[in-house]
Amino acid sequence: MPSSISLENLESYMPNRSSFRMNFETKSINDFSNYAEEFDKEGAKCFVDSDNVSAKIIFDIGTEALPEHQRNTAKLRLDKTAAFSRLLSVNGERFNQKEAANFIEDWGDFIVVSTSSAEAMTIAQAANAITKLTIESARSLTSEMDDFSEHMSAMERVEVKNKDKMPSNIDFTCVPYGGLDERKFQIKLSVLTGGDKPQVSLRIVKLEQHKEDIIEEFKEILVGKFEKSELKTFIGTC
């Protein structure tokens, strides 16, 4: 074919499209399932993206004998809630005493705090205990570690001293993504004493397991929404 000649799609000049196709996007599980119910057809599949807590339906996959163009789709992407976003932002981070106390106070409606012996603390007690932390250093040959003291195997012994009981565990309960159930996350609070002033480290316990459970819950919700149709749901992308 000569280079001066090009092929053009004449669909725009036709009274109708050559095939039905839409790219519907939403953040609502109910709207996603309602749309899927209306446009469901033979061969359609739903794929759940475990990395982004999202789902995509391809309606015009067709069959092995009669494959279609895969241009008619619906996408669902769930947003993280503000509480869950904040929770993830503190995981593995180090904070000074004021920052750690502020986190506990600011998100007190979502938090239950306890000591290492499982004794409950109020939000005010926990924040106050953190802000009053002090460090004493001494020379020692001993080596020992617990929740709130670290004795180096070298010569220095550093201990956290505080007259109040210290918070050790934080239960942070929130809805992680819009449309999912409330979930409890356990945060382990550790005091780091390597410098002149103590730092507080927060770590979410079994975070990866929580992420897997969230995806399974998401998939189960979609499967339940599609139970009246033949639409199959898979974890993966396409």
Give the positions of each predicted feature.
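An N-terminally focused, membrane-permeabilizing/fusogenic/translocator signature enriched
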Residues: M1-E68, S229-C238
